[in-house]
């Protein structure tokens, strides 16, 4: 089996847990090169994480014949342009969430991906973990009855106003950064695409949300609530609640279950705790295994460009409903 050689764009904080660490445990995968705007930073990053080569520019990394896959953890507004550049150079792409700045850009990237025949995966790592599949299985099993409502939350403490996630020119904001997870989980559990009924935001700076809550309605009549924050009185909340006609499913920390999670079903007066085999294995390891299988064997991708379009469509609608601007792609030189 030939080694799948991965090059990473930038020296982002997410790269070690999301790519470098799992690559050490996934057979036939190696992170072989890194490129960053600041070569000194790239060299320090490469030395720290055992990456053999530092490449002078993003363009050079994408053109490198000894790289098969590009990992794209750049700021949100740069995801689309650099994913397209990588695809046009014949590289498979693992792109961090959110996939693009908006739904129109997602559709454009998806068109390039489809014509290329290459693997493109949006890095919703939690979706590849067995805890996510168990959530779906419980809801679809009918144990809690007919689904009526889904609540999802992704709130983290990020009080640093200079963090790039608060930059409108880089397509920042809570709904883009953490809300994309809460929206994705809501859609996953409901198994459908929602209409955004209403949304309200709290603002960090002009046009940029630090907190957002949205109300959804699905075609079946199921309702949904999504709450997300980078800074609010709810410092940390990562959860899903699915309500049915007979009971409810509650899950704590579905996006990082390897660090600890709780899953329970309550029906009538009884409560059942659910444990999931393989839960201690990292979401990122499952994701990288799935990506490698897609490249090598044509295995299905659970978070393909089509799913990214659907998620970005909801994100755009949430911003519209809250009276905030839809994000725009950043210039590649940003």
In which residue ranges do the predicted regions lie?
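Rossmann-fold dehydrogenase core element
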Residues: 108-126, 146-149
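C-terminal helix-rich "cap/oligomerization" subdomain common to oxidoreductases
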Residues: 1-3, 69-71, 219, 290-334
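N-terminal Rossmann-like dinucleotide-binding module
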Residues: 1-49
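Predominantly a Rossmann-like dinucleotide-binding segment in NAD(P)-dependent oxidoreductases
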Residues: 126-205, 325
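Hydrophobic residues in well-ordered beta-strands that form the structural core
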Residues: 15, 55, 94-95, 120-122, ...
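Contiguous beta-strand/loop segments that form the cofactor/metal-binding neighborhood of enzyme cores
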Residues: 184-257, 278, 285-298, 332-333
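Beta-loop-alpha module in the N-terminal Rossmann-like domain of NAD(P)-dependent dehydrogenases
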Residues: 49-111
């Amino acid at each position: 089996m030939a080694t799948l050689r991965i090059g990473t764009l930038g020296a982002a904080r997410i790269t070690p847990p999301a790519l470098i660490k799992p690559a050490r445990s996934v057979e036939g995968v190696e992170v072989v090169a890194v490129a960053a705007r600041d070569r000194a930073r790239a060299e320090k990053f490469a030395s720290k994480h055992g990456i053999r080569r530092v490449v002078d520019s993003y363009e050079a990394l994408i053109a490198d014949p000894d790289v098969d896959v590009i990992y794209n953890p750049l700021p949100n507004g740069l995801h689309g342009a650099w994913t397209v550049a990588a695809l046009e150079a014949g590289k498979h792409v693992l792109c961090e969430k959110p996939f693009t700045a908006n739904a129109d850009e997602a559709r454009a990237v998806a068109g390039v991906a489809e014509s290329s025949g290459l693997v493109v995966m949006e890095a919703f790592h939690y979706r590849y973990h067995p805890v996510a599949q168990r959530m779906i299985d419980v809801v679809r099993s009918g144990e809690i009855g007919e689904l009526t409502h889904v609540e999802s939350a992704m709130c983290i403490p990020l009080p640093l106003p200079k963090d790039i996630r608060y930059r409108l020119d880089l397509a920042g904001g809570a709904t883009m950064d953490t809300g994309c997870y809460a929206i994705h989980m809501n859609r996953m559990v409901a198994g459908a695409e929602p209409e955004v009924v209403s949304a309200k935001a709290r603002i960090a700076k002009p046009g940029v949300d630090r907190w957002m809550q949205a109300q959804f309605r699905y075609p079946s009549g199921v309702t949904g609530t999504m709450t997300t924050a980078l800074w609010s009185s709810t410092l940390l909340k990562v959860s899903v609640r699915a309500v049915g006609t007979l009971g409810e499913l509650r899950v704590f920390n579905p996006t990082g279950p390897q660090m600890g999670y709780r899953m329970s079903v309550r029906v009538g007066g009884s409560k059942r705790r659910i444990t999931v085999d393989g839960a201690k294995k990292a979401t990122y390891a499952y994701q990288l295994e799935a990506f490698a299988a897609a490249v090598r064997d044509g295995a299905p991708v659970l978070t393909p460009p089509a799913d990214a379009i659907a998620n970005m469509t909801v994100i755009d609608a949430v911003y519209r409903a809250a009276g905030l601007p839809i994000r725009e792609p950043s210039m590649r030189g940003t």
